[in-house]
Design a protein with these regions (language model features):
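Low-complexity, disordered linker/stalk regions enriched in Pro/Thr/Ser/Gly
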Residues: 274-348
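Active-site-proximal helices and loops of the catalytic beta/alpha 8
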Residues: 2-273
């Protein structure tokens, strides 16, 4: 505990005893900051552990994906805190908003997903996925891409406070990696490259085909044939949640199976549907200032999307379309917007 003027503080002893299952804190890295001590403090204060944000690890991962390199060492570099007590990310809200190394411009959705696969498929650490604003973009300042100053930054004003952000977290590859992580709790992990630094493989294994699996991020422009690749997985056949393709393992080697170019595969025998579909309208509540209010209609992996309003409007829409409501509304009248669609699995 910290000591001030000869008096000992019991702040942490008091505040952390709150019944939470898992707790973590953000420690701003600087000289003489006791990251390991803070991580141990949080980890010992909750029954399911805890830790701190590992900003230096995130920086290493961003360097890798920003410069299009999936070398395994970039995803195993925890220098200040043991990996079981870390909270990890590809990028945080600060990295995105503050213009760190031109990140908003230079990190595409594709490479964010590769980074997420490498971070999240592993055994240790807790992962956080930063959901960028809807239709993010823009440049920093007035000097063009990469400058920081008086410009709009990466925010394009397509969303307002309280609106849903990017749909990337619903992407089937992101969802499959999340499912994989949850299914592999407690199993050992191994991170390696499959032939080159643009193909990253995270294996999880416990000794049987019913338990084992691997996530492969293939950033190459062509398919990656995994035949001959050494593996710790048990003998058997494993199915990719995203595409349904399979790999076969025998005697510590992959004997057959490929991963499509520029894609992520999550092979296991614990697969489940990774399809997420949504139809939404934003903002989803509030008052109507002046004569009308603009509503943005959103859809993701949905077809036959339609809208109707209680003030008499209706029609079909595609993601990003806008409508105006309230022009005929009386004072204090509530205007309701209803959106519908057919999901990727055929559900209404």
């Amino acid at each position: 505990d910290e000591v001030f003027g000869g008096k000992q503080s019991h702040y942490w002893d008091t505040i952390l005893q709150n019944g939470a299952q898992y707790q973590y804190g953000e420690v701003l890295e600087d000289a003489n900051v006791r990251e390991a001590d803070y991580a141990n403090l949080f980890n010992s204060s909750s029954p399911r552990g805890g830790g701190i944000t590992d900003s230096s690890y995130g920086h290493e991962v961003r360097n890798a994906v920003q410069f299009k390199n999936l070398g395994a060492s970039h995803f195993t570099s925890h220098s200040k805190v043991t990996e079981d007590k870390t909270v990890n990310w590809v990028e945080s809200h600060d990295n995105f908003a503050n213009g760190e190394a031109n990140i908003p411009q230079e990190l595409s959705d594709e490479w964010i997903k590769y980074g997420w696969a490498g971070v999240t498929a592993q055994k240790n650490g807790m992962s956080l996925f930063f959901d960028r604003p809807y239709k993010d973009g823009g440049t920093y300042g007035t000097g063009g891409v990469g400058t920081y100053g008086n410009g709009s930054g990466p925010f394009t004003e397509n969303s307002k406070l309280g609106d849903a952000g990017s749909d990337l977290w619903k992407d089937p590859e992101v969802v499959a990696v999340n499912h994989f992580r949850n299914a592999m709790v407690g199993e050992a992990s191994n991170v390696s490259n499959c032939g080159d630094d643009n193909c990253l493989m995270v294996e999880r294994y416990a000794g049987s085909a019913a338990q084992d699996g691997m996530v492969v991020a293939n950033a190459n422009g062509s398919d990656k044939n995994l035949a001959g690749q050494s593996t710790k997985l048990a003998n058997g056949t494993y199915t990719d949640e995203v595409t349904g393709s399979t790999i076969t393992v025998s005697g510590g080697k992959v004997t057959s199976g490929t991963v499509k170019g520029q894609s992520i595969a999550a092979f296991s025998n614990k697969t489940r549907s990774g399809k997420v579909s949504t139809a939404e309208a934003y903002p989803n509540k509030g008052t109507i200032p002046g004569e009308s209010k603009t509503i943005t209609l959103r859809s993701y992996q949905s077809t036959n999307t339609t809208y109707s309003t209680s003030d008499g409007q209706s029609g079909s829409f595609k993601d990003g379309d806008t409508i105006e409501i309230g022009s005929k509304a009386k004072s204090d009248e509530v205007v309701t917007v209803t959106v519908k669609g057919t999901g990727a699995d055929g559900e209404a």
